[in-house]
Amino acid sequence: MRRTVGAVFLLFAVAFSVVYSGRGLAAESSQSRATGGPRLVSVEPLEMCEAFPVAAQAPLRGELAQAGKTLERAPLRTIRDSFPTYSAVAVDVANNEIVLQDENLFQIMVYDRMANTPPTASLTEPKRVISGHETKVEFNCGLYIDPKTGDIYSVNNDTLDTLSVFSRSAKGNVHPDRTLHTPHGTYGIAVNEETQELFLTIQHENEVVVHRKTAQGEEKPVRVLQGNHVGLADPHGIGLDTKNQLMFVANYGNAHDKNAPGSGRFVPPSINVYPLKANGDTPPLRVISGPHTQLNWPAHVYVDQQHGEVFVANDGESSILVFRVTDNGDVAPTRVLKGAKTQIKNPTGIFVDMVHDELVVANMGNHSATVYPRAAAGDTPPMRTIRSGPLGKAALQIGNPGSVAYDTKRDAIITPN
């Protein structure tokens, strides 16, 4: 079987080479090649493959057909999460709604703010869902709600380099009201309503780009914060303190020097603080980082200007950390919300509802969004929970897997996302 298939492949290779060489020869005769350009070196006759009689080709066709059936065979089992996984959250205070990003099934889900899934129920049905090919929503990870209009700003992180903006009433498979082409790996979003500016963090380029809030299409940013002195390292969440003119950016800790191949390195996770109008290669004013901070994969952040606090969704430790806006260096959080009773599992999204004095957390690890008093600390259970799957159902958190491997020693399947 191997020899026969090899002969077929070789016949294809020879045919391709002949066609390509013929084109190259014609091109050479018509014009000279520039120095360094492709040139025809020589044409050598190749030994022809063994000819097979027609009668001998029937078994080959049968073997190839059988191989095709093998390829079409159904898998023994499939590892797939069929429930929504919440990656970001925002509260539409004016309309009493909680909006959640579902990064697993590519949806934006809108719930009543007081929704509370009973322990016996599998899930809570949303009021509205934005989903489908026309929405340009894929691997949606960042979220902002316009406090006046209720417009929904949805950030895509991976396959679609697009920021989609929808009206508050949008539902189903609808076109966005407008879109903005964003750099690949965009994650966090924040808006300065006073200056009408839109801030986005870019993971792979280690930068923050600032656009007009109403920017669309291919419009370029008005400012870009990037450079070797900036200290960004895989930036994720971003929060603004317009009262003190500060910008807070959460970093995972994957760093590299721009335009220096091979300079990639791991640095401690951090919260970097910059002037609100920082531009170019501006170093941070302060950096919150170190073992006492408990930072581990800090995702989205929220700045509570009224109380002078920064809330951090601490994905790697399944906790919510709260720092003062004046903190610097290796400082302990003023509060930590963590423990089995909290039901917090791999939180990535966070929002502080100042009107109702509540904290809302999006948990990627267990298909839930949990609500607490704003000042909650320790192992405090949620006041309300919105679930998109059965109670206790762990989220697989598989997002655009690039490869797969089997660890024979640990009997584990490993896949990077």
Region annotations inferred by a language model:
Residues 74-80, 126-134, 175-180, 221-228, ...:
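A short beta-strand motif characteristic of beta-propeller blades
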Residues 32-74, 118-122, 281, 330:
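Blade/loop signatures of beta-propeller domains
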Residues 251-268, 372:
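Short, conserved, GDST-rich strand-edge loop motifs in beta-rich repeat architectures
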Residues 80-96, 133-149, 181-197, 228-244, ...:
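Beta-rich, blade/repeat-based domains predominating
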Residues 41-43, 47-52, 78-106:
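Beta-strand-rich domains and repeat architectures in extracellular enzymes and scaffolds
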Residues 112-120, 166-172, 211-218, 273-281, ...:
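Short loop/turn segments immediately following beta-strands, especially the blade-tip
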Residues 103, 113, 157-158, 203-204, ...:
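Short loop/turn segments immediately following the C-termini of beta-strands
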